[in-house]
Amino acid sequence: MRNTKASKFSDRHLGLIEEAQVEILNALGHADINDFISSVVPEEILDAQPPDELLPKALNEIEALEELRSIAKKNQIKRSLIGLGYYGTYTPAVIQRHVFENPAWYTSYTPYQAEIAQGRLEALFNFQTLITELTGLPIANASLLDEGTAAAEAMSLSFAVNKQTKARKFIVDDQVLPQTLAVLKTRAEPLELDIEVVNLTDLVINETVFGLLIQLPGKSGQLWDPSSLIAQAHEFNALVTVAIDPLAQVLIAPMGQLGVDIAIGSSQRFGVPIGFGGPHAAFFAIKEEYKRLVPGRLVGQSIDSKGHSALRLALQTREQHIRRDKATSNICTAQALLATIASFYAVYHGPHGLEEIAKNIIYLRSQLELYLKEFGYTFAPDCRFDTLEIHCLEAPEIHRLSILSGFNLRILPLGASIEKSKGFAVSFDELSTTKELYKLCKIFADVKDKNFEPRENTNFNFKESLTSLPLRTTPWLKQQVFNNYRTETELMRYIQKLASRDFSLVNGMIPLGSCTMKLNATAELLPITWKEFSSIHPFVPSDQAKGYGYLSEQLEGWLCALTGFDGVSLQPNAGSQGEFAGLLVIRAWHKAINQADRNICLIPKSAHGTNPASAVMAGFKVVAVECDEYGNIDFEDLVLKVETYSSELGALMITYPSTHGVFEPNIRQICDQVHLHGGQVYLDGANLNAQVGLCRPGAFGADVCHLNLHKTFCIPHGGGGPGIGPIAVAKHLVAFLPSKNFHASDNNAAIGAISASPLGSASILPISWMYIRMMGADGLRQASSLAILSANYIANKLDPYFQVLFKAPNGKVAHECILDLRSIKRITGIEVDDVAKRLMDYGFHAPTISWPVAGTLMIEPTESESFEEINRFCEAMISIRSEIDAIESGITDLSNNPLRLAPHTMETVTAEIWDRPYTRQQAAFPLKDQFMNKFWPAVSRIDNAFGDRNLVCSCSTLEELSET
């Protein structure tokens, strides 16, 4: 019999062993964990027991994997040649093993602390360089969520550029992908922008148009030269966006040369599995003059204090965490890990390898055309890349035979059943072979009662198939990084070199407040590599995706049970998109009950910047609510605001526990006040890790809540994505959840598509399924309890050294605590950034700095860290306090000290000349245990201002930059 206690997953997920829990509880003055939790979570919302009857009993790792495998087998693996933005591709094994499956890459956080993030910053810099080379535009960001979202961001940017005019029309090519059009319509409606879908051959642009979106190649496969149309649009100051296929762009002239303003697309074809629609890294490239309007992260080059080249996130003043309701976008989490994979895919293949893949696709498509003509099929003689559409009476039989032979073809018209099909389309991809072509041709010939004789075209010239637009004529991707690593040995070492320059959970605790950097267990991640999940196209017939249907339905039910809500949508593929979706649901409900004028959204001043940015995107006007000395919403100010805006009140956005790290005792009264005046309560689930199994937002008054599966439910952060931000809603809002059908909807009340895939980032949902399945109700409650216990232990231990800024009246915090360093700055000049950089020398990633209050550190240990690691962090902070005291007492110089000069690199401490008033050991090994396990910052402190003044977002080579 298996030893179930020894194999209990929660024992491996939870960091505090029983003896440590007892020691902490004694230090905090509590008899047991239940007594402690009762002192933290308000009694009126605390559940006595987790919702056992609605959640499964915990399974161990082996049992959970077996159960999930049985679910995965409900999906049917076939070769999908459907296209429409999703294609078969091969992730080189060296990239799968050393990046995709490597916790050094997938457990790191967004690279805000750049000195210990040079590896992933370089990988993302390579991605940006790849995109600028593909598009011919000078600025590219470090990824967006998907192609549909990228198109919506391009529309918003185009409107922002032309906001002073009366233009409100956005022209969309009728060849645009259906999911992109669906996302555009959703985004345009609350902003009162007009979307007009047209055949571009008939288009006449005038002063009412602010932007234009072209799809090249179009969904039917056509390629054409848009130069004259671009020139026409520019006559009326309209911005032109082109959605491009990156493999097609390998061969055709860069769009920047044709005059486009913005180029977008998906990098999925560059080694990222289809995964039922996501996650995939979109790209966004733009002309120089619009660089300060670019959405998402932007990696730029700067210099460190030694004058060495260094990378960091550039132009951050554009972003929502600073600009709030005036931000260029609400995008926070993007798709960093997938962009990293795409960049390594380009490094692996190099320019010539990518060209050969693209040429083979064209060859197969051209051969298919020749054979189909011989069989008697007819089609327009257009210039095409990978796709061929055929309309014929035999379509239903062709689809039936294709499926029997293991192929999915695109059903025409889109959204039709096989029985009502009027045609088919074939989209070739990297995995396509002549063998597959011949199998398909045999089907097409048999249906027409024709003979098929395979033959090879030895005289094929791809240029003859691309005659309708200019081709790429000059060498590209000449940078060393895309040409140096032709052997696996060299590529493996390059990947490892970059990984070693990054701090991740492999190296130590990442105590970022509001980020929940908990364990991402290997067993949770293993299933996402299974073909049954990774190879399924999002538009396959529903009977081929029953596994995804079963998994998503089960996961939605569990999330409803844990939150106390009645319905869940898994479609939003980031927390920011969950916010947007939730607010649109509220807005749709108000419209449905004839109260469309309710457009005021109340938001506490402590809220995360995505909240006001999302509210504006959803068509709301933001009104701020004050906070009190304990970090709670100022109830008197809330009452004043709801009464002032009673007839216009649409929603209150509130984070719980608050962004100040406390459980607000009157949360029910807050919700009641909003409801009394006709509003709805949107609860930001960023801090749900303090609630799971303890209390349920739907039970204490919230109407909508988004959940960050990449925080609370163990999807790794990946250095800045992927993420999933599903929304859970109360019963009266269920009908308004996002539509899953991009072609037609049976539910007219549903808001439109939020992401470019019906199930969002579907392929990583198994991670959260595994976490819940292995933890069970009791394990989840224990996780929340220990996360809160660890945070209170840190607050209690560090309180004599640093002021804990916000506490409940009984001295307790929630799952995170905020240390106030502002008085230290006034006395010594030492800033919070100095402490953050000094923590790198101690072997830690810094907590969240200067948010939600400037000059503070917000610490969240999570439930996964051990007592030893938590104590090591506390020891580091206490040691740093002693270094500050030495400055305050005059023992240490105000400017020449370990904090001001942190972080200390290996180059610095091994230099022949050491002219600092502290020892090399104090600089690099301030804790005794570091001699055996030292993480070195890759660069000295980076000059952020220099990087923004001299913006460089792509380059010839990093090596060449280091010489300049």
Swiss-Prot record:
Q: Which cofactor does it need?
A: pyridoxal 5'-phosphate
User: Alphabetically, which GO biological process terms does the record hold?
Assistant: glycine decarboxylation via glycine cleavage system
Q: Please write the reaction equations for the catalytic activity of this protein.
A: N(6)-[(R)-lipoyl]-L-lysyl-[glycine-cleavage complex H protein] + glycine + H(+) = N(6)-[(R)-S(8)-aminomethyldihydrolipoyl]-L-lysyl-[glycine-cleavage complex H protein] + CO2
- Spell out which residues are annotated as carrying N6-(pyridoxal phosphate)lysine: 711
The UniProt GO MF terms for this protein read: glycine binding; glycine dehydrogenase (decarboxylating) activity; pyridoxal phosphate binding
Keyword Oxidoreductase found: yes
Which GO terms of the cellular component aspect does the record hold?
A: cytosol; glycine cleavage complex
Give UniProt keywords alphabetically. Oxidoreductase, Pyridoxal phosphate
This entry's Enzyme Commission designation comes to 1.4.4.2
Question: Does the keyword Oxidoreductase feature in the UniProt annotation?
Answer: yes
**InterPro entries attached to this UniProt entry:** GcvP, GDC-P_C, GDC-P_N, GDC_P, PyrdxlP-dep_Trfase, PyrdxlP-dep_Trfase_major, PyrdxlP-dep_Trfase_small
Q: Which domain of life is it from?
A: Bacteria
**Family, as annotated:** Belongs to the GcvP family.
Fetch the HAMAP family from UniProt.
GcvP
Q: How does it assemble?
A: The glycine cleavage system is composed of four proteins: P, T, L and H.
Q: What does this protein do?
A: The glycine cleavage system catalyzes the degradation of glycine. The P protein binds the alpha-amino group of glycine through its pyridoxal phosphate cofactor; CO(2) is released and the remaining methylamine moiety is then transferred to the lipoamide cofactor of the H protein.
Q: What is this protein called?
A: Glycine dehydrogenase (decarboxylating)
Origin organism is Prochlorococcus marinus (strain SARG / CCMP1375 / SS120)
Q: What gene codes for this chain?
A: gcvP
